A protein has these predicted regions:
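Alpha-helical cap/lid subdomain in secreted, periplasmic
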Residues: 98-261, 265, 269, 276
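Acidic/histidine-rich helix-loop elements
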Residues: 48-57, 83-99, 139-142, 146
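Serine-esterase "nucleophile elbow" of acetyl-processing enzymes
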Residues: 28-84
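Secretory targeting and sorting signals
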Residues: 2-29
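A structural preference for short, hydrophobic beta-strand core positions in alpha/beta folds
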Residues: 13, 17, 78, 174, ...
Length: 284
């Protein structure tokens, strides 16, 4: 019931802000010459992997490579910050940006300066707000409720700022998250209970973020679906079986080998594919 009340509260706030946004003027047509893809986010947007750190093999890089094939004038502006939360995206404190105090401020400044030349904006944010709620091996529901409230409030402000700065010219896209804590299934009955509970939390987070993204006109990359997050169908695994969602987490992330939540190169390719399904390479 507590989570439901949070969702209702967020809904009222979102609709109120959306009414304000409808008064924004439409961005001018993209001029000839250089165009831009602006990518915001946390470590996923930086292609982080535990053995190499930030990389050029993440989903952002793979999306850009695909778009660049048909749009050689397109340049990538990669603003993501490993460890970023919705709060630090707004206020700063982790990564530095020349002339800007936060990732959001840097994005807003770039969008304003290059209004009409930005073709794509993607974002992933929120996982670092809520992942600590399972740090002890159990899910702290009070932490979850507080984190969801923070995410809802901050994401609203982030999206208001991005749309006000970028206008209606770019294609905007956000993503749902996969659930790395499904890997706990391999630890036995207690881990399996944690895994099932974590899916409920992931669904609540994804539902909240998807609702806010759609209110502000963002396309949704269904990463949760691509990782089969809700599919507990048993499939072969080693000498036995596990649910498909568990096998997928083991195959596409480092959770079952290095106990690290980040995707491997294959996992980043799956995330990129989810974005590519909703982001068009056609000219605006």
């Amino acid at each position: 019931m507590r989570l439901r009340r949070l969702g209702e509260f967020a809904s009222v706030m979102i609709v109120s802000v959306a009414v304000v946004l409808t008064g924004q003027s439409v961005a001018s047509a993209t001029p000839p010459g250089t165009t831009y893809y602006v990518a915001l986010g946390d470590s996923l947007s930086q292609g982080f992997m535990p053995l190499t750190g930030n990389s050029n093999e993440g989903y952002v890089d793979q999306i850009y490579a695909q778009l660049h094939q048909s749009q050689p004038q397109l340049q990538l502006v990669k603003l993501g910050c490993s460890g970023e939360t919705t709060t630090t995206m707004r206020q700063g404190g982790i990564c530095s940006y020349p002339g800007a105090g936060s990732q959001l401020a840097a994005a807003v400044a770039f969008l304003r300066t290059h209004r009409g030349s930005v073709k794509y904006v993607t974002i992933d944010i929120g996982a670092n707000d809520i992942d600590p709620c399972a740090a002890s091996g159990v899910i702290d529901q009070t932490c979850v409720a507080e984190s969801l409230a923070t995410i809802g409030r901050n994401l609203l402000a982030i999206l208001v700022s991005l749309r006000a700065a970028g206008g209606f010219g770019p294609q905007y896209a956000g993503m749902t998250y996969y659930d790395p804590f499904l890997a706990a299934w391999l630890l036995g009955p207690a881990g399996q209970a944690l895994a099932r509970e974590s899916v409920q939390v992931a669904n609540t987070l994804n539902g909240l973020e998807a609702f806010e993204y759609r209110i502000f006109g963002l396309q949704m990359a269904d990463v949760s679906g691509a990782f089969h997050t809700n599919d507990f169908t048993e499939v072969p695994f080693g000498s036995g079986t596990v649910p498909l969602n568990v096998a997928t987490i083991c195959a596409l992330t480092f959770m079952c080998t290095l106990n690290n939540i980040h995707p491997n190169v294959r996992g980043y390719a799956v995330i990129a594919g989810a974005f590519q399904a909703v982001v068009s390479a056609k000219p605006n």
